[in-house]
Amino acid sequence: MACNSTPMGTYEHLLLNVSNTLDPGDTPLSAPLRISLAIMMLLMIVVGFLGNTVVCIIVYQRPAMRSAINLLLATLAFSDIMLSLCCMPFTAITLITVRWHFGDHFCRLSATLYWFFVLEGVAILLIISVDRFLIIVQRQDKLNPRRAKMIIAASWVLSFCISAPSFTGWTFMEVPARAPQCVLGYTEFPAERAYVVTLVVAVFFAPFGVMLCSYLCILNTVRKNAVRVHNQSDSLDLRQLTGAGLRRLRRQQQQASLDLSFKTKAFTTILILFVGFSLCWLPHSVYSLLSAFSRRFYYSASFYTTSTCVLWLSYLKSVFNPIVYCWRIKKFREACIELLPHTFQILPKVPERIQRKIQPSTIYVCNENQSAV
Protein backbone atom coordinates (compact mmCIF):
# COMPACT_ATOMS: atom_id res chain seq x y z
CA MET A 1 0.00 0.00 0.00
CA ALA A 2 1.15 3.53 -0.60
CA CYS A 3 -0.14 6.91 0.42
CA ASN A 4 0.89 10.18 -1.12
CA SER A 5 -0.26 13.63 -2.14
CA THR A 6 1.57 16.38 -3.96
CA PRO A 7 2.83 19.67 -2.54
CA MET A 8 0.56 21.77 -4.80
CA GLY A 9 -2.28 19.31 -5.23
CA THR A 10 -1.88 19.12 -9.02
CA TYR A 11 -1.67 15.35 -9.15
CA GLU A 12 -2.51 12.40 -6.94
CA HIS A 13 -0.75 9.12 -6.29
CA LEU A 14 -2.65 5.95 -5.62
CA LEU A 15 -3.57 5.80 -1.92
CA LEU A 16 -4.29 2.12 -1.62
CA ASN A 17 -2.66 -0.47 -3.82
CA VAL A 18 -3.63 -4.04 -3.06
CA SER A 19 -0.84 -5.41 -5.22
CA ASN A 20 1.73 -4.06 -2.77
CA THR A 21 0.19 -5.94 0.16
CA LEU A 22 2.34 -8.85 1.22
CA ASP A 23 1.14 -12.04 2.77
CA PRO A 24 2.86 -12.94 6.04
CA GLY A 25 4.60 -15.79 4.31
CA ASP A 26 6.01 -13.51 1.60
CA THR A 27 8.07 -11.30 3.90
CA PRO A 28 11.84 -11.91 3.86
CA LEU A 29 11.78 -12.26 7.66
CA SER A 30 10.65 -15.54 9.18
CA ALA A 31 7.84 -15.57 11.73
CA PRO A 32 10.12 -16.44 14.71
CA LEU A 33 12.49 -13.61 13.79
CA ARG A 34 9.64 -11.12 13.42
CA ILE A 35 8.20 -12.12 16.79
CA SER A 36 11.63 -11.90 18.42
CA LEU A 37 12.19 -8.41 17.03
CA ALA A 38 8.73 -7.35 18.15
CA ILE A 39 9.33 -8.67 21.68
CA MET A 40 12.65 -6.85 21.83
CA MET A 41 10.91 -3.69 20.67
CA LEU A 42 8.30 -4.08 23.41
CA LEU A 43 11.13 -4.38 25.94
CA MET A 44 12.66 -1.26 24.44
CA ILE A 45 9.34 0.53 24.93
CA VAL A 46 9.21 -0.45 28.61
CA VAL A 47 12.85 0.39 29.34
CA GLY A 48 12.75 3.61 27.35
CA PHE A 49 9.50 4.75 28.94
CA LEU A 50 10.52 3.95 32.52
CA GLY A 51 14.08 5.24 32.22
CA ASN A 52 13.15 8.51 30.57
CA THR A 53 10.21 9.00 32.92
CA VAL A 54 12.59 8.82 35.87
CA VAL A 55 14.64 11.64 34.32
CA CYS A 56 11.54 13.82 34.00
CA ILE A 57 10.38 13.01 37.54
CA ILE A 58 13.78 13.87 39.03
CA VAL A 59 13.84 17.28 37.38
CA TYR A 60 10.18 17.95 38.19
CA GLN A 61 10.28 16.94 41.85
CA ARG A 62 13.62 18.49 42.79
CA PRO A 63 13.92 22.27 42.35
CA ALA A 64 17.68 22.01 42.90
CA MET A 65 17.90 19.85 39.77
CA ARG A 66 16.18 22.39 37.51
CA SER A 67 19.35 23.82 36.05
CA ALA A 68 19.50 24.73 32.39
CA ILE A 69 21.30 21.56 31.34
CA ASN A 70 18.95 19.34 33.34
CA LEU A 71 15.91 21.01 31.77
CA LEU A 72 17.40 20.14 28.39
CA LEU A 73 18.01 16.54 29.45
CA ALA A 74 14.41 16.30 30.71
CA THR A 75 13.14 17.59 27.36
CA LEU A 76 15.28 15.03 25.55
CA ALA A 77 13.81 12.33 27.80
CA PHE A 78 10.26 13.55 27.15
CA SER A 79 10.74 13.40 23.37
CA ASP A 80 12.00 9.82 23.74
CA ILE A 81 8.96 8.96 25.89
CA MET A 82 6.58 10.26 23.24
CA LEU A 83 8.48 8.40 20.53
CA SER A 84 8.16 5.19 22.55
CA LEU A 85 4.43 5.64 23.07
CA CYS A 86 3.28 7.14 19.76
CA CYS A 87 5.30 5.16 17.22
CA MET A 88 7.01 2.05 18.54
CA PRO A 89 3.88 0.04 19.54
CA PHE A 90 2.42 0.26 16.03
CA THR A 91 5.70 -0.80 14.47
CA ALA A 92 5.87 -3.78 16.83
CA ILE A 93 2.33 -4.85 15.89
CA THR A 94 3.09 -4.51 12.19
CA LEU A 95 6.25 -6.57 12.59
CA ILE A 96 4.18 -9.46 13.93
CA THR A 97 1.20 -9.26 11.57
CA VAL A 98 3.03 -7.93 8.46
CA ARG A 99 0.00 -5.71 7.86
CA TRP A 100 -0.82 -2.12 8.73
CA HIS A 101 -4.17 -2.16 10.54
CA PHE A 102 -4.51 1.55 11.29
CA GLY A 103 -5.28 3.15 7.94
CA ASP A 104 -3.20 5.18 5.52
CA HIS A 105 -4.02 8.53 7.16
CA PHE A 106 -2.81 7.37 10.56
CA CYS A 107 0.24 5.91 8.85
CA ARG A 108 1.16 9.36 7.58
CA LEU A 109 0.40 10.83 11.02
CA SER A 110 2.62 8.27 12.76
CA ALA A 111 5.46 9.05 10.35
CA THR A 112 5.05 12.76 11.05
CA LEU A 113 5.12 12.17 14.81
CA TYR A 114 8.17 9.97 14.35
CA TRP A 115 10.12 12.72 12.60
CA PHE A 116 8.74 15.37 14.98
CA PHE A 117 9.98 13.72 18.17
CA VAL A 118 13.25 12.64 16.58
CA LEU A 119 13.89 16.20 15.40
CA GLU A 120 13.21 17.55 18.88
CA GLY A 121 15.58 15.05 20.48
CA VAL A 122 18.32 15.90 18.00
CA ALA A 123 17.75 19.64 18.52
CA ILE A 124 18.15 19.26 22.29
CA LEU A 125 21.32 17.22 21.88
CA LEU A 126 22.66 19.91 19.55
CA ILE A 127 21.83 22.66 22.08
CA ILE A 128 23.60 20.74 24.85
CA SER A 129 26.67 20.28 22.66
CA VAL A 130 26.86 23.98 21.78
CA ASP A 131 26.37 24.88 25.45
CA ARG A 132 29.28 22.62 26.46
CA PHE A 133 31.38 24.24 23.73
CA LEU A 134 30.62 27.75 25.00
CA ILE A 135 31.35 26.79 28.61
CA ILE A 136 34.58 24.86 28.10
CA VAL A 137 36.09 26.49 25.00
CA GLN A 138 34.72 30.05 25.01
CA ARG A 139 34.29 30.25 28.81
CA GLN A 140 30.83 31.74 28.33
CA ASP A 141 28.20 30.32 30.66
CA LYS A 142 25.13 32.26 29.53
CA LEU A 143 22.51 29.52 29.46
CA ASN A 144 20.33 29.96 32.56
CA PRO A 145 17.03 28.12 33.21
CA ARG A 146 14.93 30.96 31.79
CA ARG A 147 16.86 31.05 28.52
CA ALA A 148 16.84 27.27 28.38
CA LYS A 149 13.03 27.25 28.54
CA MET A 150 12.83 29.79 25.71
CA ILE A 151 15.23 27.76 23.57
CA ILE A 152 13.30 24.56 24.31
CA ALA A 153 10.04 26.19 23.23
CA ALA A 154 11.68 27.44 20.02
CA SER A 155 13.06 23.96 19.30
CA TRP A 156 9.58 22.43 19.58
CA VAL A 157 8.19 25.00 17.13
CA LEU A 158 11.05 24.46 14.68
CA SER A 159 10.73 20.67 14.87
CA PHE A 160 7.02 20.93 14.16
CA CYS A 161 7.57 23.23 11.18
CA ILE A 162 10.07 20.83 9.63
CA SER A 163 8.06 17.65 10.22
CA ALA A 164 4.52 18.92 9.52
CA PRO A 165 4.86 19.03 5.70
CA SER A 166 5.24 15.24 5.66
CA PHE A 167 1.66 14.97 6.95
CA THR A 168 0.24 17.47 4.46
CA GLY A 169 1.76 15.64 1.51
CA TRP A 170 5.12 17.18 0.72
CA THR A 171 6.69 13.78 0.24
CA PHE A 172 5.80 10.27 -0.81
CA MET A 173 5.10 7.85 2.03
CA GLU A 174 5.10 4.07 1.78
CA VAL A 175 2.52 2.24 3.87
CA PRO A 176 3.40 -1.26 5.15
CA ALA A 177 3.67 -4.11 4.24
CA ARG A 178 6.72 -3.13 2.18
CA ALA A 179 8.12 -1.75 5.44
CA PRO A 180 7.14 -2.25 9.09
CA GLN A 181 6.33 1.46 9.42
CA CYS A 182 5.28 4.35 7.22
CA VAL A 183 8.59 5.42 5.65
CA LEU A 184 9.86 7.79 2.99
CA GLY A 185 9.29 6.25 -0.43
CA TYR A 186 10.85 6.55 -3.86
CA THR A 187 9.81 9.62 -5.84
CA GLU A 188 10.94 11.38 -9.00
CA PHE A 189 9.35 14.75 -8.21
CA PRO A 190 11.95 17.45 -7.40
CA ALA A 191 9.86 19.10 -4.67
CA GLU A 192 9.43 15.82 -2.80
CA ARG A 193 13.10 14.97 -3.13
CA ALA A 194 14.06 18.43 -1.90
CA TYR A 195 11.93 17.94 1.20
CA VAL A 196 13.52 14.55 1.89
CA VAL A 197 16.98 16.10 1.67
CA THR A 198 15.92 18.95 3.97
CA LEU A 199 14.46 16.51 6.48
CA VAL A 200 17.49 14.21 6.57
CA VAL A 201 19.96 17.10 6.74
CA ALA A 202 18.01 18.65 9.63
CA VAL A 203 17.77 15.34 11.49
CA PHE A 204 21.32 14.08 11.10
CA PHE A 205 23.93 15.63 8.84
CA ALA A 206 23.76 19.27 10.00
CA PRO A 207 23.60 18.44 13.74
CA PHE A 208 26.30 15.80 13.31
CA GLY A 209 28.66 18.29 11.66
CA VAL A 210 28.11 20.98 14.30
CA MET A 211 28.43 18.55 17.21
CA LEU A 212 31.53 16.91 15.77
CA CYS A 213 33.30 20.27 15.40
CA SER A 214 32.21 21.27 18.92
CA TYR A 215 33.53 18.08 20.47
CA LEU A 216 36.84 18.28 18.64
CA CYS A 217 37.33 21.81 19.97
CA ILE A 218 36.32 20.70 23.46
CA LEU A 219 38.75 17.78 23.39
CA ASN A 220 41.57 20.09 22.35
CA THR A 221 40.71 22.58 25.13
CA VAL A 222 40.45 19.89 27.81
CA ARG A 223 43.82 18.48 26.75
CA LYS A 224 45.45 21.93 26.94
CA ASN A 225 43.90 22.62 30.35
CA ALA A 226 45.15 19.32 31.71
CA VAL A 227 48.67 20.06 30.47
CA ARG A 228 48.57 23.57 31.95
CA VAL A 229 47.42 22.36 35.38
CA HIS A 230 50.14 19.70 35.37
CA ASN A 231 52.83 22.18 34.33
CA GLN A 232 51.80 24.70 36.98
CA SER A 233 52.06 22.03 39.64
CA ASP A 234 55.52 20.99 38.48
CA SER A 235 56.89 24.55 38.22
CA LEU A 236 56.04 25.65 41.77
CA ASP A 237 58.83 26.36 44.24
CA LEU A 238 57.20 25.41 47.52
CA ARG A 239 60.16 26.74 49.52
CA GLN A 240 59.26 30.33 48.53
CA LEU A 241 55.73 30.10 49.94
CA THR A 242 54.57 30.84 53.47
CA GLY A 243 52.24 28.52 55.33
CA ALA A 244 49.11 30.57 54.49
CA GLY A 245 50.20 31.04 50.89
CA LEU A 246 50.86 27.34 50.51
CA ARG A 247 47.43 26.44 51.88
CA ARG A 248 45.75 28.97 49.57
CA LEU A 249 47.68 27.69 46.58
CA ARG A 250 46.78 24.11 47.37
CA ARG A 251 43.10 25.06 47.60
CA GLN A 252 43.32 26.79 44.23
CA GLN A 253 45.02 23.78 42.69
CA GLN A 254 42.44 21.44 44.18
CA GLN A 255 39.58 23.60 42.91
CA ALA A 256 41.13 23.86 39.44
CA SER A 257 41.68 20.10 39.34
CA LEU A 258 38.12 19.51 40.57
CA ASP A 259 36.63 21.87 37.99
CA LEU A 260 38.64 20.19 35.24
CA SER A 261 37.55 16.76 36.43
CA PHE A 262 33.91 17.85 36.61
CA LYS A 263 33.90 19.41 33.15
CA THR A 264 35.70 16.41 31.67
CA LYS A 265 33.23 13.94 33.18
CA ALA A 266 30.24 16.03 32.06
CA PHE A 267 31.68 16.33 28.57
CA THR A 268 32.39 12.59 28.42
CA THR A 269 28.74 11.83 29.21
CA ILE A 270 27.50 14.13 26.45
CA LEU A 271 30.10 12.68 24.08
CA ILE A 272 28.76 9.17 24.73
CA LEU A 273 25.25 10.40 23.90
CA PHE A 274 26.63 11.87 20.67
CA VAL A 275 28.30 8.60 19.70
CA GLY A 276 25.07 6.72 20.39
CA PHE A 277 23.12 9.19 18.28
CA SER A 278 25.60 8.85 15.40
CA LEU A 279 25.60 5.04 15.42
CA CYS A 280 21.81 4.83 15.63
CA TRP A 281 20.99 7.45 13.01
CA LEU A 282 23.68 7.30 10.34
CA PRO A 283 22.22 4.09 8.80
CA HIS A 284 18.69 5.50 8.91
CA SER A 285 19.74 8.75 7.23
CA VAL A 286 21.50 6.95 4.39
CA TYR A 287 18.54 4.58 4.09
CA SER A 288 16.07 7.49 3.81
CA LEU A 289 18.06 9.16 1.04
CA LEU A 290 18.43 5.90 -0.88
CA SER A 291 14.70 5.24 -0.55
CA ALA A 292 13.81 8.57 -2.13
CA PHE A 293 16.49 8.66 -4.84
CA SER A 294 17.28 5.04 -5.77
CA ARG A 295 14.54 3.11 -7.53
CA ARG A 296 16.70 0.00 -7.57
CA PHE A 297 17.18 0.07 -3.80
CA TYR A 298 13.56 0.92 -3.05
CA TYR A 299 12.13 -1.95 -5.08
CA SER A 300 14.80 -4.48 -4.13
CA ALA A 301 13.89 -7.72 -2.37
CA SER A 302 15.89 -6.69 0.69
CA PHE A 303 14.04 -3.41 1.28
CA TYR A 304 11.76 -4.83 3.98
CA THR A 305 14.67 -6.37 5.88
CA THR A 306 16.71 -3.18 5.59
CA SER A 307 13.75 -1.08 6.75
CA THR A 308 13.25 -3.29 9.78
CA CYS A 309 16.91 -3.12 10.80
CA VAL A 310 17.35 0.64 10.45
CA LEU A 311 14.05 1.43 12.17
CA TRP A 312 14.88 -0.89 15.04
CA LEU A 313 18.30 0.76 15.36
CA SER A 314 16.82 4.27 15.34
CA TYR A 315 14.41 3.34 18.15
CA LEU A 316 17.31 1.95 20.15
CA LYS A 317 18.49 5.51 20.81
CA SER A 318 15.46 6.10 23.07
CA VAL A 319 16.65 3.26 25.29
CA PHE A 320 20.32 4.17 25.05
CA ASN A 321 20.04 7.57 26.76
CA PRO A 322 18.64 6.47 30.16
CA ILE A 323 21.15 3.61 30.27
CA VAL A 324 23.95 6.15 29.85
CA TYR A 325 22.42 8.32 32.59
CA CYS A 326 22.32 5.37 34.98
CA TRP A 327 25.88 4.42 34.13
CA ARG A 328 27.44 7.88 34.25
CA ILE A 329 25.32 10.02 36.59
CA LYS A 330 25.50 9.24 40.29
CA LYS A 331 22.50 11.41 41.19
CA PHE A 332 20.40 9.58 38.62
CA ARG A 333 21.27 6.22 40.18
CA GLU A 334 20.46 7.54 43.65
CA ALA A 335 17.13 8.92 42.44
CA CYS A 336 16.26 5.58 40.82
CA ILE A 337 16.88 3.83 44.15
CA GLU A 338 14.73 6.37 45.97
CA LEU A 339 11.87 5.93 43.50
CA LEU A 340 11.90 2.16 43.84
CA PRO A 341 9.41 0.65 46.29
CA HIS A 342 11.03 -0.16 49.63
CA THR A 343 10.45 -3.87 49.08
CA PHE A 344 12.83 -3.76 46.09
CA GLN A 345 15.57 -1.85 47.88
CA ILE A 346 18.07 -4.50 48.95
CA LEU A 347 20.81 -2.29 50.37
CA PRO A 348 20.06 0.24 53.13
CA LYS A 349 20.63 3.88 52.28
CA VAL A 350 23.82 5.34 53.74
CA PRO A 351 23.28 8.62 55.63
CA GLU A 352 24.71 11.68 53.91
CA ARG A 353 26.94 12.50 56.91
CA ILE A 354 28.60 9.08 56.68
CA GLN A 355 28.88 9.38 52.89
CA ARG A 356 30.94 12.54 53.33
CA LYS A 357 33.30 10.73 55.66
CA ILE A 358 33.67 7.89 53.20
CA GLN A 359 33.94 10.17 50.16
CA PRO A 360 35.01 13.72 51.05
CA SER A 361 34.47 14.92 47.48
CA THR A 362 30.71 14.84 48.10
CA ILE A 363 31.01 18.27 49.70
CA TYR A 364 31.43 19.64 46.18
CA VAL A 365 27.91 20.72 45.24
CA CYS A 366 26.97 21.80 41.73
CA ASN A 367 25.49 25.23 41.33
CA GLU A 368 22.53 25.91 39.05
CA ASN A 369 24.72 26.38 36.00
CA GLN A 370 26.25 22.94 36.41
CA SER A 371 24.60 19.63 35.85
CA ALA A 372 24.71 16.24 37.40
CA VAL A 373 26.22 14.75 34.24
Swiss-Prot record:
Single Gene Ontology MF annotation: G protein-coupled receptor activity
Keywords: Cell membrane, G-protein coupled receptor, Glycoprotein, Membrane, Receptor, Transducer, Transmembrane, Transmembrane helix
Transmembrane regions: 39-59, 76-96, 110-130, 150-170, 199-219, 270-290, 307-327
Locations listed in the record: Cell membrane
Primary location class: membrane
Coiled coil stretches, renumbered: none
Tissue: Brain specific.
Ranges facing Extracellular side: 1-38, 97-109, 171-198, 291-306
Protein name: Probable G-protein coupled receptor 45
